[in-house]
Design a protein with these regions (language model features):
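Short, low-complexity N-terminal tether/leader segments at secretion or assembly junctions of large
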Residues: 1-17
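Terminal low-complexity, poorly structured segments
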Residues: 6-7, 23, 109-110, 117-119, ...
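Intrinsic-disorder/low-complexity peptide segments enriched for small residues
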Residues: 8-9, 37, 112, 139, ...
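Intrinsically disordered, low-complexity regions of eukaryotic proteins
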Residues: 9, 111-113, 151, 160
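Collagenous Gly-X-Y triple-helix signature in extracellular proteins
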Residues: 16-107, 146, 154-401
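Autoprocessing Asn-cyclization modules and mimics
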Residues: 104-147
Length: 401
């Protein structure tokens, strides 16, 4: 990666920062910015932003798999007041990854183990043309459930599909894609009622039933997202995804894609650390807090960080200077706006750098349980269903101390 520090370069840095301690430390111990350890030293010594100002690009190679290496440069996008460096991939990951997969409708905990028999779930909220108040989803289990079993109904990622009309259902163990039993649904109230499912009542406010929208489209919550797990794992395909709630289901890509960090160099992995990442929660699921904090080595940018008007200001990180500069270059007098189209925000795919792609942000669309924000292949800032396999631009924070 990058440059090699010479004494002349060091003298220029010293002249800019007037930091004799950092200068003499670097001269004594040496550094090269062709490795990540050298870059980390620059950040720790407080001189990185002079050698690598915002807008600089750090060359790097990423291994998509054992046989495919891809050019994957990092952009320097921001420094905070503490001198921490923020980096973001210039290109998007080469393959699509859902923000989150459609979830199970019901799961069994230790106190609620269903025996073989007929059950029904009343529909309490209209949703699209498919979910009709007054109908009930009826199905018959042929075997007893054990703790952790999930009942998953294939709703076709379409709220206009009626879940009572001959829809396939399966019982899975948490994290498994192997069906333990299966059948099809009917509209009826025979057997035992498991409760009434609503559109936004999840997070155990409605027993063990999920929210309708999350059953159809998945969840827009960053902390529980599949893409967050993918970005923060070194594990091979089939080993990086674990359920984050009782209803959580793996995306198909979990079985075929290696964790993102598994393609990064050992030098890079040795200098990144988990950092607190704050993300706003949606307003429809009854959370007591407006935000939550995760601890991530890799994260996706938020609306705020990309200098886009956020739904909840001042919580999802700082305005990154890189995007402030892009807004100025685009002739804006303020921030990019939700719903606006900005060609300057178009992202191209790593390994195919003439192909514009749509990239997820980590910000939830706060008015729904199942949406997250993205910037599409035309530069349009929008939100969409979590199940969709968009790309993303990994970001990280190199700590100054």
């Amino acid at each position: 990666m990058g440059k090699v520090g010479t004494e002349a370069t060091l003298l220029k840095i010293y002249d800019k920062v007037n930091n004799i301690e950092a200068y003499t430390d670097i001269l004594a111990n040496g550094w090269t910015t062709h490795d990540w350890h050298g870059l980390k030293r620059l950040v720790e010594d407080g001189v990185a932003q002079h050698e690598y100002p915002v807008g600089s690009r750090i060359t790097e190679t990423w291994a998509k798999d054992a046989n495919t290496n891809i050019s994957a440069p990092w952009d320097v996008v921001h420094y905070d007041e503490g001198g921490n460096m923020f980096l973001k991939w210039h290109y998007a990951i080469p393959d699509g990854m859902p923000f989150d997969a459609p979830e199970a409708i019901w799961y069994a905990d230790a106190e609620n183990l269903l025996t073989a028999g007929t059950y029904n779930i009343a529909i309490g909220s209209a949703y699209g043309n498919g979910w009709v108040v007054g109908q009930a989803i009826q199905f018959t289990l042929t075997e007893d459930l054990v703790e952790g079993d999930q009942i998953f109904i294939n709703c076709g990622t379409d709220y206009n599909i009626n879940p009572t009309n001959n829809r396939a259902w399966n019982v899975y163990a948490q994290g498994s894609t192997t069906s333990k039993q299966s059948g099809t649904t009917t509209n009826g109230t025979d057997g035992t009622n498991l409760g009434t499912i609503g559109n936004v009542s999840a997070q155990r406010t409605n027993g063990l039933l999920n929210a309708i929208s999350r059953v159809v489209y998945g969840s827009g919550r960053w902390s529980e997202s599949a893409i967050r797990q993918y970005l923060n794992s070194t594990s091979e395909a089939g080993a990086w995804w674990i359920p984050k709630n009782g209803w959580d289901r793996p995306p198909a890509q979990a079985a075929t894609m290696r964790g993102f960090l598994g393609g990064c160099s050992e030098d890079f992995l040795n200098i990144i650390e988990e950092v607190p990442v704050v993300t706003a929660l949606n307003t429809v699921e009854g959370f007591t807090d407006t935000t939550e904090t995760t601890y991530d080595k890799i994260f996706l940018p938020s609306l705020q960080e990309m200098y886009i008007n956020p739904q909840l200001a001042g919580v999802e990180g700082e305005d990154w200077d890189y995007y402030k500069d892009l807004a100025e270059e685009a002739g804006l007098t303020g921030k990019f706006t939700q719903g606006g189209t900005y060609p300057i925000l178009i992202t191209y795919q790593a390994g195919s750098t003439t192909s514009p792609v749509t990239v997820w942000l980590r910000s939830a669309y706060r008015g729904y349980a199942y949406n997250a924000w993205y910037v599409n292949f035309t530069g349009n800032v929008l939100s969409y269903y979590a199940y969709y396999a968009f790309r993303g631009c990994p970001a990280c924070k190199i700590l100054a101390s």
